[in-house]
Amino acid sequence: MQSVFEDLYSKKILEEEFGYTCFLQTLIDNRIPYKKTRIPSNMILLTEDTINTKVYFIEKGIVSLEKNKNVISFLGSNQIAGLNDYFMAEANLYTARVIETITAYEFNKEDIICSIIGMQEGWLYLYLNNRNHENVLIEKCNLMRGNGENRLKESLEQLGRYFGNEKEGVLRIPKCFTKKIIANYSNLSVRSVTHLCRKLVEAGFLAENSKSFVLLDKYGKIEPEVTTI
């Protein structure tokens, strides 16, 4: 159902005028202090149940969002970590962990909130950011309704759609999405993922002996690579 806000502002206008690119440029134009930083894999950006003071506008790379060690979602290019609430003293809901080295613009959260409060339509930046995040969570909830094989297949399709690289008729998921991470996200054991991957290879959905997860379904098959998944 379309919200009241989206009746006033079309989806296209919201994305063009209040999306990631415009939000970041507005902060820079308003001389909000920031530093551009490169953060390697396995580093923690934010810790759940801890008050955070930083916000990261991700230019490149991938971050996992975890709750009680369960992977809930992922953030990638043109997404924001650390701005899912409007209150300075609000503790983080998730732990944000870098799984593929990121390049990001790092701001103080207080500076961003104060800047937004001073804008006539500043709240729309927060609304759009949170709406996009909620859509991802809804997708995850729907994914969890299936059986193990369907959960794995749909997880791989989702990650391929958001983070994959389509080339030579196939869709290759970044190597940072290991079996362990995929298993956690799909609510499966690593052993189950290994078993189900064999079935998906036999079904022509995955490439065999690939260095990363490679989706073949609807893309056509490729020559197998040397190492196993």
Predicted regions and their residues:
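Cyclic-nucleotide recognition modules
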Residues: 72-138
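Cyclic nucleotide-binding regulatory module and flanking cytosolic helices
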Residues: 1-41, 81, 85-86
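Polybasic "coupling" helices that flank or enter modular domains
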Residues: 124-187
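A cytosolic small-molecule/anion-sensing beta-strand core signal
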Residues: 40, 59-60, 76, 100
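Glycine- and acidic-residue-biased ligand/ion/polar-headgroup-sensing regions
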Residues: 52-68, 77-79
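Phosphate-/nucleic-acid-contacting segments
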Residues: 161-229
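Short, small/polar residue-rich loop motifs at catalytic or cofactor-binding pockets
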Residues: 31-32, 50-52
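Short phosphate-coordinating micro-motif centered on Lys-Gly-acidic
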Residues: 39-40, 44-50
